[in-house]
Design a protein with these regions (language model features):
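Phosphate-binding P-loop
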Residues: 31-37
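Hydrophobic anchor at the beta1->P-loop junction of P-loop NTPases
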Residues: 40-42
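N-terminal pre-Walker A segment at the start of P-loop NTPase domains
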Residues: 2-29
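Conserved nucleotide-sensing/catalytic segment adjacent to the nucleotide-binding pocket
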Residues: 66-71, 76-126
Length: 207
């Protein structure tokens, strides 16, 4: 069942980190604020830190460790740990939409069955998953070496630059990220994200 998604973000926040550990820590702070039904759209070129970021989300959510990119299986479900920091919290559904060329192919993997009860993170999801929820949080990761960080005006251009799985065989084995500066852009869409998440600590003051 499709919904009418928000087309324009209610806010945008740019954060800068210098190491993979900082990327992980920022994501863990965000993960602690997430709740069942949240949809995150994760975008970043090869080596941008998508897996590190998702691992941090998992830590903040209190789900089972061992998060890797679900490139070949499309979807991995990481269950909440009863003895973790958030017992009874939502599971993490981690999706790699790289090989899915359209919204209809997203529907074929039945994310709607877990969407309301889990936190769903979709890599390469822009232009494919917006119809699943009226609210979403977009997370763009940019390496200092590679594409320049973009703001709201460049979001459409970034989507156009995402690789088409029909035209390339490049895979993202983003399992170990280098310690190098990264820019992380968060955008909130819809009523769930009417305000910025409370990230706490040093991240609150990041320009």
């Amino acid at each position: 069942v499709s919904v009418l998604p928000a087309e324009m973000p209610t806010w945008e926040q740019t954060l800068r980190v210098t190491t993979a550990d900082e990327t992980h820590a920022l994501a863990a702070a965000l993960g602690a604020e997430l709740q069942a039904g949240d949809l995150l759209v994760l975008t970043g070129e090869l080596g941008a830190g998508k897996t590190t970021f998702t691992q941090g989300l998992g830590e903040g959510l209190g789900v089972r460790a061992g998060i890797i990119s679900p490139t070949f299986v499309l979807v991995r479900i990481h269950p909440n740990l009863p003895d973790g920091p958030r017992p009874g919290g939502p599971d993490l559904v981690h999706v790699d939409a790289y090989r899915l060329g359209s919204a209809s192919e997203i529907d074929d993997i039945d994310l709607e069955n877990t969407l309301d009860s889990s936190v769903t993170v979709v890599e390469w999801g822009r232009g494919r998953v917006e119809h699943l929820s009226e609210s979403r949080l977009e997370v763009d990761l940019h390496r200092a070496i590679g594409l320049e960080p973009i703001g709201l005006a460049g979001a459409a251009e970034a989507a156009a630059r995402e690789p088409n799985p029909a035209h390339t065989e490049i895979l993202d084995f983003d399992t170990e990220d280098l310690d190098e500066p990264r820019t992380i852009v968060l955008r909130g869409f819809g009523p769930r994200w009417s305000t910025k998440p409370a990230l706490g600590g040093a991240f609150e003051g990041t320009p």
